[in-house]
């Protein structure tokens, strides 16, 4: 008998023999959500084969079942909730909440997830359960090339989770700044070798403006007037570093 009582659900980790049913539920859910989510970019048989080949030693797949069988699933890899799907005919009955609470119990220190920007029902669901939106992108990093949002549940110690996220971003930022400085230096070398003007005297305001505009388009959120002064400093300091290196 079907029920909307989440206490009637049973949860268990998936076994390889379950993955065919997981693929069925995934395909049904994505089809039913066509107004909120873009279509998958690969043929259904390829998607099915991919799901049926999941390595359950790397990817945790948790099933929600009742007396009628599989009604939902969630997948976790490391500190990421990679997916959470409920059978279309069982949505709105507390199953998604139960799966999300299961994920919270399995990852008490917090986890992140990606959701399409167009999927407003899912974004609202996650916000109601305490998740926060941390990042918006133009979708160039996902197969569908559709704008998406990185959300996070910061766990039972939110400040610790968020500061760890900042530390991770700063580590990547340091690497990117080093690359930016090196590339700026290489460009100045090419300029001067061709008889042009390098350093601060050779700054190209039109190109710098185009860089800022491209960055703002790529990652919606920070406005041009916020990004422009940051890039002015980054470019300026990289040029100063190049000029200083020529005096050594």
Residue ranges and their predicted role:
Residues 10-24, 156:
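A short beta-loop-alpha structural element at the N-terminal edge
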Residues 24-51:
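Conserved GNAT-fold acetyl-CoA-binding loop/helix
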Residues 51-63, 80:
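A short helix-loop-beta-strand connector motif used in the catalytic cores of GNAT acetyltransferases and
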Residues 63, 69-85:
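Conserved beta-strand in the GNAT
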Residues 97-98, 118-136, 141-145:
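Conserved active-site alpha-helix within GNAT-family acetyltransferase domains
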Residues 106-118:
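Conserved GNAT acetyl-CoA-binding A-motif
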């Amino acid at each position: 008998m079907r029920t909307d009582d989440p206490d009637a659900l049973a949860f268990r980790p998936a076994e390889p023999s379950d993955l065919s049913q997981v693929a069925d539920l995934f395909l049904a859910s994505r089809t039913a959500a066509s107004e909120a989510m873009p279509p998958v970019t690969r043929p259904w048989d390829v998607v099915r084969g991919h799901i049926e080949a999941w390595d359950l030693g790397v990817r945790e797949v948790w099933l929600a079942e009742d007396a009628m069988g599989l009604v939902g699933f969630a997948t976790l890899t490391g500190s990421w909730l990679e997916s959470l799907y409920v059978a279309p005919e069982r949505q709105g009955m507390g199953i998604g909440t139960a799966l999300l609470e299961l994920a919270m119990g399995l990852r008490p220190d917090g986890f992140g997830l990606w959701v399409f920007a167009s999927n407003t029902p899912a974004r609202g669901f996650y916000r109601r359960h305490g998740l926060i939106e941390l990042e918006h992108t133009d979708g160039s990093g996902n197969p569908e090339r559709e704008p998406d949002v990185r959300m996070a549940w910061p766990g039972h110690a939110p400040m610790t989770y968020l500061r760890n996220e900042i530390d991770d971003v700063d580590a990547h930022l340091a690497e990117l700044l080093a690359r930016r400085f090196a590339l700026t230096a290489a460009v100045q070398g090419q300029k001067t070798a061709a008889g042009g003007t390098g350093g601060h005297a050779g700054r190209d305001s039109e190109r710098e403006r185009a860089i800022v505009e491209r960055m703002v388009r790529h990652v919606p959120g920070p406005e041009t007037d916020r990004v422009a002064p940051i890039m002015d400093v980054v470019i300026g300091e990289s040029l100063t570093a190049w000029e200083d290196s020529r005096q050594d």
